[in-house]
C-alpha cells in the first residue's frame, strides 16, 4: 500500500508539472486497477497450486520494478505511464490471493478474523507511512524519489520473504510439533489435483454475496486511497506539506480498529455464536457505517470535521475483517486463494470505474458531495445484499 498511495500524493506536483486536469489524473490513478484486475484469479489459482510464498514473492519483485520505472514512464508520456501503472497493478494483483492461500493453511478457523485484522492493518499502516513520508521526499528530492525509494524497500522485503517464509506449516524448518498440531486442528486443506470448479463457484449465492460486499467496500476504500489527498488539498485548502499529517488520522484509527474488530469477531465465534451471524453483524457495522459517513462528509467545510467523519468511517469499516473478508475460507478453504482472486477481481472494478468516475464528476461538476454520496449509496446496497444472501457453510472442499 505504500507503493499504491505514494502516487495519490505525488500526482499533485506531477499534475502541475505535466498539466494534467482531474480526468487525466483519474486515468493515471485508475490504470493501476486495470492490471490489478487482470491477474487476480490466475494469481489465486497459482497460489493454491504452487504455494503463496513464491507467488507473493515474485509479485513484490514485479511491482517494485514498475514502481522504480514510474518516473521514466511519466517523462516519456501519459500513455506510457498508464501502461506502466497497469503492469505494476498486475504485480500487486497476486497479493491477497496469495495471502488467502497461506492463511487457509496456516490459521485455524477460530483465529482467522484476528489474523486478517493483523494483516489488513498493514493497509492503513502503509497508507499512513506513504501519506507522511511522500510529501517529505517530494519536497526534499523531487517527486521522482517517492518512487525510487519505495521500490528499493520492495526489493529488500522480497529478499527477506524468500529467506524466512513457507507456503505450508509442515514445510517450515523451525515450526514446533505443538504449533503444527494446533494449526492443523481444523484439518489441513486438501491438495488441489484439478482445476477449481469455476462455474459452480460463480453460481453460488454465498460467493456472490462476498463479491458484492467486496465490490461495495472497495468503492469507498479506493476512493479514499486515491482522492483523499486531493480532497484535503484542493477541496479544503490544506497546504501540500501538511496533507499527510491530516490524512493519517483515519488510517491510524484503522490500524487499531482492524486488530480490535478481528479479535471481537473471533471471541464471538468462540463463545458459541453461529459463524454466519457473526459475519452478518460485522458486515452490517462495516458497510452501514461507511454508507452513513460517505453521505455527509462532502458537506464538511473544515478539515477537522472532514477528518472526524473519515475517522469514524474507517473505524466502523474495519468490522469487515469479521465479515466478508474471512468468509471465503468458511465456504471453500481448499480454494481460498482462487476464491479471493474471483472476489478481488470484482472488487478491483471500483478502482477503475470508481476512481475514474470521481475524476469525471469533479471535472464536470466540481462536486465532492456527489462523489462521496455515490460511494455511500453503493455501500448501502452492498450491506443489504450481503445480509440477504451470505452463508458460512462449507460448500466446496
Which residue stretches match the model-derived regions?
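Helix-loop-helix hairpin linking two adjacent transmembrane segments in secondary transporters
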Residues: 119-172
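C-terminal transmembrane helical hairpin of 12-TM major facilitator-type secondary transporters
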Residues: 276-323
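Paired small-residue
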Residues: 62, 66-69, 79-87, 305-312
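Extracytoplasmic
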Residues: 1-22, 224-229
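C-terminal ends and interior cores of transmembrane alpha-helices
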Residues: 61-75, 288-301
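Cytoplasmic helix-loop-helix junction between adjacent transmembrane helices
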Residues: 84-124
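Extracytoplasmic gate region of multi-pass secondary transporters
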Residues: 7-8, 204-261, 320-321, 325
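Residue-level signature of mid-helix packing/kink "hotspots" within the transmembrane helices
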Residues: 5, 33-41, 93, 127-128, ...
